[in-house]
Amino acid sequence: MSRPIRVIVLILISGSLFVPALRPAEELLGPVGREAILAHDPSWAGAAAAYQPDPAALDKLRGLTREVRIEVYFGSWCSDSAAHVPALFKVLEMADAPLLQAACFGVPEVKEKRAPYFQGREIARLPTFLVLVDGREVGRIVETPERSVEADLVRILGL
């Protein structure tokens, strides 16, 4: 390869290293619904569609006898949120358990601006799924599930 062509190729390659990752420009902040989250970034909808929850765990979640609320604190800019929030949505959809509900809260990327979005909760990493039974926290999934979203929920709920 001639020297001028090598220089051009080198410039093109090095310039591409500084292109920011493509993601939606606007952060999702505060209370936000499932549909808005999935519409915000199509890759999240794809991740939800592709996720295959464990059928045995889903059966256990369907057997809930008490109301369970999951408070989901996530960052629309966060790769761990992009992996695990869509998985939770698929679990909720496939479990189809009326007593299992989620409320989602978007959090800013800038750490110094996050406190008001945590509603007084102690949250250090995202996503954080707070699992509440009768309004009392019984467990949480922080950043990455130990096994899977559905298996961790079953464990936390003692099902």
Across the structure, where does each feature detected by a protein language model lie?
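Bacterial N-terminal signal peptides that target proteins for export
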Residues: M1-I8
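Bacterial N-terminal signal peptides
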Residues: I8-L17
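N-terminal leader/targeting and pre-domain segments
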Residues: R23-T65
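Stable alpha-helical elements in mature extracytoplasmic
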Residues: A57, H84-A87, V149, L153
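Local sequence-structure signature of Cys/Sec-based thiol-disulfide redox active-site neighborhoods
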Residues: G63-M94
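Thiol-based oxidoreductase modules, predominantly thioredoxin-like and allied folds used
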Residues: V72-S76, L99-K113
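Structural alpha/beta surface segment adjacent to cysteine/selenocysteine redox centers
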Residues: K113-L126
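Non-catalytic, surface beta->alpha helical segment in thiol-disulfide oxidoreductase systems
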Residues: R125, V131-L159
